[in-house]
Design a protein with these regions (language model features):
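Catalytic core of membrane glycerolipid acyltransferases/transacylases, capturing the structured
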Residues: 1-29, 36
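Non-catalytic C-terminal accessory region of glycerolipid acyltransferases
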Residues: 32-156
Length: 156
């Protein structure tokens, strides 16, 4: 899943589509992208989502930077969330850069987070989704800090 502007260029459209990627409109709750995510998960596929909505370089992942889509999809599909912290990406591809630079990056994988149970109606509790999003934010912050340290990047 990636921002829809990545599909406007034929080369990047081909690249991301060939990897199984699909666009998401970040300006609203993109129901089509959320449903595509649920379908892929139901088929046993992995779906990569960035709950911050864009690249952030720290030092703090603020609560208002987080979007609820990951917690919603995980809970709707009753699929655990596997949080991942990435360190060093700002050196490999600084914001606005056109090319990736050789640079040390570190990926740290955390323990899975359990989705919230569905209501009897089969719906997802909005307050439960928000609580799971906050749990995810806390987990990601710790993983990001660890990944930055391992990549030798000051987290400031």
């Amino acid at each position: 899943m990636g921002k829809d502007s990545l599909w406007k260029n034929p080369a990047s459209d081909w690249f991301f589509s060939s990897l199984g990627g699909f666009p998401i409109n970040r300006d609203s709750a993109d129901r089509e992208a959320l449903n595509t995510s649920l379908e892929l998960l139901a088929e046993g596929e992995a779906v990569v989502m960035f709950p911050e909505g864009t690249r952030r370089h720290g030092p703090t992942i603020e609560p208002d930077h987080m979007r609820d889509g990951v917690a919603y999809v995980a809970s709707r599909g009753q699929i655990p969330i596997v949080p991942v912290g990435i360190g060093g990406s700002e050196r490999a591809m600084p914001s606005g850069a056109k090319y990736i630079r050789p640079s040390k990056m570190v990926v740290v994988v955390g323990p899975p987070l359990t989705p919230i149970p569905l209501k009897e109606s089969g719906r997802v509790s909005r307050s439960g989704v928000r609580a799971l999003t906050e749990d995810l934010r806390v987990s990601l912050q710790g993983l990001f800090d660890d990944a930055q340290r391992r990549a030798g990047v000051p987290n400031s």
